[in-house]
Amino acid sequence: MVREKVRVSTRTLQWKCVESRIDSKRLYYGRFILSPLMKGQADTIGIAMRRILLGEMEGTCITRAKSEKISHEYSTIVGIQEPVHEILMNLKEIVLKSNLYGIRDASICFKGPGYVTAQNIILPPSVVIVDNTQHIANVTEPIQLCIGLQIERDRGYRINTLKNFQDGSYNIDAIFMPVRNANHSIHSYVNGNEKQEILFLEIWTNGSLTPKEALYEASRNLIDLFIPFLHAEEEKLNFENNEHKVTLPLFTCHDLLAKTKLKKKKKEIAFKSIFIDQLELPPKIYNCLKKSNIHTLLELLTKSKEDLMKIEHFRVEDVKHILDILEIEKHFP
């Protein structure tokens, strides 16, 4: 573990890694500071970085498995200790590292008896396993276990409603997010007559990249979002020229209603793409929502106060905490 005493500049804006450690092959931690910032800037940057880290980072994982020995997801295979469903869940947990794009094929071909682990996966050259010891199955008899795998790189979650196909392949719910969690906090102080802030940013990753690499990538992604505004400034459009003149049509009540419906539809699509991982939820509330199959902000917004109270282990203060968050989120444009 590396930890540094925090010393901040009073003039030049700079960032620094003040703590880093490797808790396991699949859990890296880093703590960073950015200072000095003017009042309000730390929260602006912290919220944006956290959303990018949890929602926009790309990762690689197994998204489909196929085997002739599998009749259905909840079946068992003679000579294998785990049921098929558990094997698929173990494959879902395998952490991969790559820069591939598109779909790649991989496979497992194991002769029992013995333990099948991540190191038994035959991968394309562009893909690396982060933890070779991850358990997949226990083959208890001298049989051949062959599984075809599909690997993809994407972002966020992919919850598959269609689980199995006629060719004997099974979709696996994919968690592409390489960042397990991200938090930010703010320390305010007075420098002379000026109020300033220090932003503390904590990042946990799954080992496919370090927290420092995640910070770099998230920063690039955030910068890319603002580049179009810079280009618009550089173009310096001449609106005095006739070719740039636009005649605005008159709106009717029907047009206004249609526009309102379209805006509502766009908002629903936006909420559908925001996962509850991107909300600042306590671990207990987050876990209860996931167990209730609530994965997105849209799914959360459709729940009433009474629906939330029916969730197992939920208390009144938990529901109030969620309602406070929803009150903020639903006003986003």
Swiss-Prot record:
Q: List the cysteine pairs that form cystine.
A: none
Identify the enzyme class: transferase
Coarsely, its chief localization is plastid
Organism whose genome encodes this protein: Lotus japonicus (Lotus corniculatus var. japonicus)
Q: What does this protein do?
A: DNA-dependent RNA polymerase catalyzes the transcription of DNA into RNA using the four ribonucleoside triphosphates as substrates.
Family listed = Belongs to the RNA polymerase alpha chain family.
How are the domains described in the entry?
The N-terminal domain is essential for RNAP assembly and basal transcription, whereas the C-terminal domain is involved in interaction with transcriptional regulators and with upstream promoter elements.
Spell out the protein name for this chain.
Answer: DNA-directed RNA polymerase subunit alpha
Top-level division of the source organism's lineage: Eukaryota
What cellular-component terms does GO give this entry? chloroplast; DNA-directed RNA polymerase complex; mitochondrion
Q: Which InterPro entries match?
A: DNA-dir_RNA_pol_insert (IPR011262), DNA-dir_RNA_pol_RpoA/D/Rpb3 (IPR011263), DNA-dir_RpoA (IPR011773), RBP11-like (IPR036603), RNAP_asu_C (IPR011260), RNApol_insert_sf (IPR036643)
In its UniProt record, which GO terms are filed under biological process? DNA-templated transcription
Q: From the UniProt entry, list the residue stretches annotated as the region Alpha C-terminal domain (alpha-CTD).
A: 266-333
MF terms per GO, please?
Answer: DNA binding; DNA-directed RNA polymerase activity; protein dimerization activity
Q: What keywords appear on the UniProt entry?
A: Chloroplast, DNA-directed RNA polymerase, Nucleotidyltransferase, Plastid, Transcription, Transferase
What reaction gets catalysed by this protein?
RNA(n) + a ribonucleoside 5'-triphosphate = RNA(n+1) + diphosphate
Per the UniProt record, one Pfam family is RNA_pol_L
List its EC numbers.
Answer: 2.7.7.6
Where in or outside the cell is it found? Answer: Plastid, Chloroplast
Residue numbers spanned by region Alpha N-terminal domain (alpha-NTD): 1-233
Quaternary structure, per UniProt, is: In plastids the minimal PEP RNA polymerase catalytic core is composed of four subunits: alpha, beta, beta', and beta''. When a (nuclear-encoded) sigma factor is associated with the core the holoenzyme is formed, which can initiate transcription.
- HAMAP family linked to this entry: RNApol_bact_RpoA
